[in-house]
Regions:
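Short glycine-/Asp-/Thr-/Trp-enriched loop segments that recur within the blades
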Residues: 124-128
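Solvent-exposed serine/threonine-rich low-complexity stretches and specific carbohydrate-binding patches
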Residues: 112-123
Protein backbone atom coordinates (compact mmCIF):
# COMPACT_ATOMS: atom_id res chain seq x y z
CA UNK A 1 0.00 0.00 0.00
CA UNK A 2 1.41 3.39 -1.01
CA UNK A 3 1.00 6.43 1.26
CA UNK A 4 1.71 9.83 -0.27
CA UNK A 5 2.19 13.08 1.65
CA UNK A 6 3.13 16.63 0.74
CA UNK A 7 3.40 20.02 2.42
CA UNK A 8 1.27 22.89 1.15
CA UNK A 9 1.34 26.63 1.84
CA UNK A 10 -1.44 28.89 0.56
CA UNK A 11 -2.67 26.10 -1.70
CA UNK A 12 0.75 25.58 -3.34
CA UNK A 13 2.79 22.41 -2.88
CA UNK A 14 6.15 23.10 -1.26
CA UNK A 15 8.77 20.51 -2.21
CA UNK A 16 8.39 16.99 -3.46
CA UNK A 17 5.73 14.43 -2.64
CA UNK A 18 6.88 11.86 -0.10
CA UNK A 19 5.91 8.31 -1.05
CA UNK A 20 6.09 5.50 1.49
CA UNK A 21 5.43 1.89 0.57
CA UNK A 22 3.72 0.22 3.54
CA UNK A 23 3.68 -3.53 4.00
CA UNK A 24 1.05 -5.09 6.23
CA UNK A 25 1.34 -8.44 7.96
CA UNK A 26 0.42 -10.07 11.29
CA UNK A 27 3.27 -8.27 13.12
CA UNK A 28 2.56 -4.78 11.76
CA UNK A 29 1.67 -2.23 14.47
CA UNK A 30 1.68 -4.88 17.20
CA UNK A 31 3.24 -4.15 20.61
CA UNK A 32 6.89 -5.06 21.14
CA UNK A 33 8.03 -6.30 24.52
CA UNK A 34 11.68 -5.29 24.41
CA UNK A 35 14.06 -2.81 25.93
CA UNK A 36 15.13 -0.55 23.04
CA UNK A 37 13.43 2.70 22.12
CA UNK A 38 13.72 2.13 18.38
CA UNK A 39 12.37 -1.44 18.32
CA UNK A 40 9.03 -0.02 17.12
CA UNK A 41 10.71 0.26 13.72
CA UNK A 42 10.57 -3.53 13.48
CA UNK A 43 6.78 -3.52 13.11
CA UNK A 44 5.98 -0.13 11.55
CA UNK A 45 5.29 -1.48 8.05
CA UNK A 46 8.15 0.46 6.45
CA UNK A 47 11.17 -1.23 4.92
CA UNK A 48 14.65 0.21 5.24
CA UNK A 49 16.66 1.25 2.20
CA UNK A 50 20.28 0.41 1.44
CA UNK A 51 21.17 3.38 3.64
CA UNK A 52 21.27 2.10 7.20
CA UNK A 53 20.98 5.77 8.29
CA UNK A 54 17.45 6.19 6.84
CA UNK A 55 15.84 5.84 10.30
CA UNK A 56 14.05 2.58 9.42
CA UNK A 57 16.76 0.30 10.80
CA UNK A 58 16.93 -0.90 14.40
CA UNK A 59 20.55 -1.56 15.31
CA UNK A 60 22.66 -3.32 17.92
CA UNK A 61 26.39 -3.41 18.50
CA UNK A 62 28.94 -4.51 21.10
CA UNK A 63 28.01 -8.13 20.26
CA UNK A 64 24.69 -7.67 21.94
CA UNK A 65 22.39 -10.58 22.46
CA UNK A 66 19.36 -9.30 20.62
CA UNK A 67 15.95 -10.25 21.95
CA UNK A 68 12.46 -8.87 21.47
CA UNK A 69 8.95 -10.27 21.66
CA UNK A 70 5.97 -9.36 19.50
CA UNK A 71 2.54 -9.56 21.14
CA UNK A 72 0.07 -10.45 18.38
CA UNK A 73 -2.77 -9.53 20.81
CA UNK A 74 -4.40 -12.92 20.35
CA UNK A 75 -3.63 -16.40 19.06
CA UNK A 76 -2.83 -16.46 15.36
CA UNK A 77 -1.98 -19.23 12.91
CA UNK A 78 1.63 -18.58 11.89
CA UNK A 79 3.04 -19.90 8.62
CA UNK A 80 6.14 -17.86 7.82
CA UNK A 81 8.58 -15.60 9.66
CA UNK A 82 10.98 -13.20 7.93
CA UNK A 83 13.22 -10.37 9.08
CA UNK A 84 15.09 -7.83 6.98
CA UNK A 85 18.80 -7.33 7.55
CA UNK A 86 21.34 -5.03 5.88
CA UNK A 87 24.99 -5.68 5.11
CA UNK A 88 27.27 -2.70 4.59
CA UNK A 89 30.75 -4.22 4.59
CA UNK A 90 32.61 -0.90 4.59
CA UNK A 91 30.76 0.29 7.68
CA UNK A 92 31.00 -3.00 9.60
CA UNK A 93 27.26 -3.75 9.40
CA UNK A 94 26.69 -7.49 9.06
CA UNK A 95 24.06 -10.16 9.60
CA UNK A 96 24.09 -11.86 13.01
CA UNK A 97 25.62 -15.25 13.77
CA UNK A 98 22.23 -16.68 14.65
CA UNK A 99 18.51 -15.86 14.55
CA UNK A 100 16.10 -17.96 16.64
CA UNK A 101 12.30 -17.77 16.67
CA UNK A 102 10.13 -19.13 19.48
CA UNK A 103 6.40 -18.87 20.18
CA UNK A 104 4.22 -18.83 23.28
CA UNK A 105 0.59 -18.62 24.29
CA UNK A 106 1.29 -17.02 27.70
CA UNK A 107 4.65 -15.16 27.34
CA UNK A 108 6.14 -17.57 29.91
CA UNK A 109 6.60 -20.95 28.26
CA UNK A 110 8.16 -20.79 24.80
CA UNK A 111 8.57 -23.47 22.17
CA UNK A 112 11.12 -23.38 19.37
CA UNK A 113 9.99 -22.76 15.80
CA UNK A 114 13.33 -22.51 14.03
CA UNK A 115 16.86 -21.19 13.99
CA UNK A 116 19.11 -19.79 11.28
CA UNK A 117 22.89 -19.94 11.68
CA UNK A 118 25.42 -18.19 9.47
CA UNK A 119 29.07 -19.02 8.78
CA UNK A 120 31.81 -16.40 9.05
CA UNK A 121 32.04 -16.39 5.24
CA UNK A 122 28.32 -15.59 5.01
CA UNK A 123 28.48 -12.96 7.75
CA UNK A 124 31.46 -11.05 6.41
CA UNK A 125 30.51 -11.15 2.72
CA UNK A 126 31.63 -7.97 0.95
CA UNK A 127 29.14 -5.50 -0.50
CA UNK A 128 26.12 -3.45 0.43
CA UNK A 129 22.83 -5.32 0.21
CA UNK A 130 19.62 -6.13 2.04
CA UNK A 131 18.32 -9.64 2.66
CA UNK A 132 15.20 -11.09 4.20
CA UNK A 133 15.94 -14.17 6.30
CA UNK A 134 12.93 -16.41 6.63
CA UNK A 135 11.77 -19.67 8.13
CA UNK A 136 8.68 -21.82 7.91
CA UNK A 137 6.57 -21.63 11.07
CA UNK A 138 4.56 -24.72 10.16
CA UNK A 139 1.11 -23.29 10.86
CA UNK A 140 1.70 -23.16 14.61
CA UNK A 141 -0.80 -21.13 16.66
CA UNK A 142 0.52 -18.65 19.21
CA UNK A 143 0.07 -15.16 20.62
CA UNK A 144 3.71 -14.22 21.30
CA UNK A 145 6.66 -14.46 18.93
CA UNK A 146 10.11 -14.09 20.48
CA UNK A 147 13.11 -13.34 18.27
CA UNK A 148 16.63 -13.85 19.61
CA UNK A 149 19.80 -13.15 17.66
CA UNK A 150 23.49 -13.17 18.48
CA UNK A 151 25.75 -10.42 17.12
CA UNK A 152 28.37 -11.20 14.49
CA UNK A 153 31.31 -10.53 16.79
CA UNK A 154 34.59 -8.82 16.00
CA UNK A 155 35.44 -8.06 12.36
CA UNK A 156 38.29 -10.39 11.31
CA UNK A 157 41.82 -9.24 10.48
CA UNK A 158 41.04 -9.45 6.74
CA UNK A 159 38.14 -6.94 7.12
CA UNK A 160 38.45 -3.23 6.27
CA UNK A 161 37.60 -2.61 9.95
CA UNK A 162 39.69 -5.30 11.69
CA UNK A 163 39.07 -5.63 15.41
CA UNK A 164 35.92 -3.49 15.31
CA UNK A 165 32.74 -4.99 16.68
CA UNK A 166 30.28 -5.65 13.88
CA UNK A 167 26.82 -4.11 14.07
CA UNK A 168 23.49 -5.76 13.27
CA UNK A 169 20.63 -3.85 11.60
CA UNK A 170 17.07 -5.22 11.26
CA UNK A 171 14.32 -3.26 9.52
CA UNK A 172 11.06 -5.20 9.57
CA UNK A 173 9.57 -8.37 10.97
CA UNK A 174 7.12 -10.06 8.61
CA UNK A 175 4.81 -12.77 9.93
CA UNK A 176 2.32 -14.48 7.62
Amino acid sequence: QMVKAATFMNGKQMGETLELQLTWNKATAKPLLGNRKNEMLLVNGLRGSLKYTDFEWCNWNRNDSISFTIDLLGKEKLNKFAIGCITNYGMGAHKPKMIRVEVSDDNKTYRAVGELNFSLEEIYKEGTFRNDYSMDMGGVSARYVRVTAKGAGICPDSHVRPGQEARVYFDEVIIE
